[in-house]
């Protein structure tokens, strides 16, 4: 977007503000002074490294007048963010997205801008344009980017009234921005823009002082996208990139990307026969092949035994449930866009459901409404209470009453409503609490096709789901137990580099359910348990769900990427919605507290992550093929088969390579197939009842009696030794699957 644009409208503000620095000291500044001015007063060196500022927890431009962001007492609690601050990198990348968009608009004609947010590892910008961009175009785009960076032009913020903002975007032929102003900003009265040279973009910011702060930038890939994620909307081109304050950091990050490609679970999964995605079955629906299924069974058996020993009760629930149950839980229609359409026992059910959805979106013309009424009558459905002149809510109510009298089902999007029904299936006493229910339950999400990614993002996923129903007094101990369980599970598979994110409520918000007393108790209990555990954790006020605080384990893999695994979530909402009760020791009825927890998250995503973490080379206890017996020749096949039988009876996953060829080739094939151990046998071993054991990692271990080999290998399995993953050195944790923020 290119234009001359007005400055921000003047606002009434005090002539001076008091700036409170992190050390508690106060500085008096003119209201039109900026954080950069404060930095310059301290030192020119500091000013050169200032990227943005943090004011009372909110990141703002370093060049924004302090009077605009002072509190009611004209005080500005200010923290300067420099290139060393982690949050400053996000600001840099946001500005890099603008610079990239500016470069693309210089090169190509007819470019309509969508959104350009940051992601966990970089940024992207979506474009609607006549020409197709490919990775072959990246060099010329990057060359133009470098010209913009070299010019060091400043970013400037200005604010317009909504009508003025719409006119500006209309004048610039930016129809997507016009649509967003008209439909995407609610009742927002003003709109902020940023200008850099000839480029102007609607944006909430913040941005770096000038483009010259971008010391390293790289375009990474191009993909398809939809306007606002709506598959029925306009198709866009999405260009991804990343940026850093230092060229060495970029080089390290690019090496991390290359290493991630070498470990791609989709490639390794196909190469080693672990899983498959078949379009005839459906995108996002995993077929677990025998080797992958063995890994899954091992994980399930491991966790099942552990849960049973910790007082959990197994349950099973169906793959579908009545829509009314999900209306009670709130999952429907709130999460409808990410769910498969309801299943109906009547042919006309789908018609009425689509009809209701159109009314809900206020997207039904009079002609279409008449056609729907006629179509329903064709199926024998008459709706005498349906009045076209009534409000949409009244019309939806008529349709809903018809639906209530006919069976409607959903593919299960969550296990928790089913578990609530299991709790409520019989009277409960405080003596039965805590009640811990667990299930490896498969749920279904209608993810967009473009978001699907092997096992990492799927439409059918099996969660290691458990729900604990307890009293308020039991929350602390149950939380401690779930934290210990999650630690145990993660460390058992070699994931010992993690931190915990504790999501708390916003004390200034009233959106939360449950009493303030319960929230205070729960948050204090969670914080206390984490402090006592010695775990590294950070608190995130305002990040709690409306129904309770939670703790997420953020696990770093061997190449430095961070994965959200292992969630513990308190819930005051579902027990209330389902009217769950237990009789207390006071003989009165009470609501239980519900705790959701899943150490794996989903077996698909967890297994996919392990494939990449171990580069397909699973530790012995998880491996789908632990031992391969290699006979030296046909004469030794009979003995090899006998050895394999003994190993199988000892509980190992074992195969025999009875193919023709030299043993060196068989060893090489076993190494390629990532088999943990090879047992080489020939006439000498047959005569002495031994095997020549070979470790995939350490090589030849020499000959030994079969019983000795079995004892050695059993110890490795029983202790769940992990020797495969090699820690990598990376510049930062790149979060996987971070949510982008529009506008």
UniProtKB/Swiss-Prot annotation:
Residues the record lists as binding Zn(2+): 416, 467, 596
InterPro entries according to UniProt: aa-tRNA-synt_IIb, aa-tRNA-synth_II, aa-tRNA-synth_II/BPL/LPL, Anticodon-bd, Anticodon-bd_dom_sf, Beta-grasp_dom_sf, TGS, TGS-like
Renumbered residue ranges of the record's region Disordered: 1-30
UniProt KW keywords: Aminoacyl-tRNA synthetase, ATP-binding, Cytoplasm, Ligase, Metal-binding, Nucleotide-binding, Protein biosynthesis, RNA-binding, tRNA-binding, Zinc
Enzyme class label: ligase
Gene this chain is encoded by: thrS
Region ranges (Catalytic): 264-619
Insert as annotated region, ranges: 354-404
Swiss-Prot/TrEMBL catalytic activity: tRNA(Thr) + L-threonine + ATP = L-threonyl-tRNA(Thr) + AMP + diphosphate + H(+)
Free-text cofactor note: Binds 1 zinc ion per subunit.
GO cellular component, one term: cytoplasm
Top-level lineage group: Bacteria
One GO BP: threonyl-tRNA aminoacylation
Name by which UniProt lists this protein: Threonine--tRNA ligase
The organism of origin for this protein: Rhodopirellula baltica (strain DSM 10527 / NCIMB 13988 / SH1)
A UniProt-annotated Pfam family: tRNA_SAD
Coiled coil ranges: none
Subunit structure as annotated in this protein's UniProt entry: Homodimer.
Protein role: Catalyzes the attachment of threonine to tRNA(Thr) in a two-step reaction: L-threonine is first activated by ATP to form Thr-AMP and then transferred to the acceptor end of tRNA(Thr). Also edits incorrectly charged L-seryl-tRNA(Thr).
One GO MF term: ATP binding
Annotated ranges, domain TGS: 13-76
NCBIfam families (alphabetical): thrS (TIGR00418)
Family according to the record: Belongs to the class-II aminoacyl-tRNA synthetase family.
The protein's required cofactors: Zn(2+)
Bias-annotated ranges (Low complexity): 1-15
Subcellular location: Cytoplasm
Gene3D superfamilies: 3.10.20.30, 3.30.54.20, Anticodon-binding domain, Bira Bifunctional Protein, Domain 2, Threonyl-trna Synthetase, Chain A, domain 2
EC number of this enzyme: 6.1.1.3
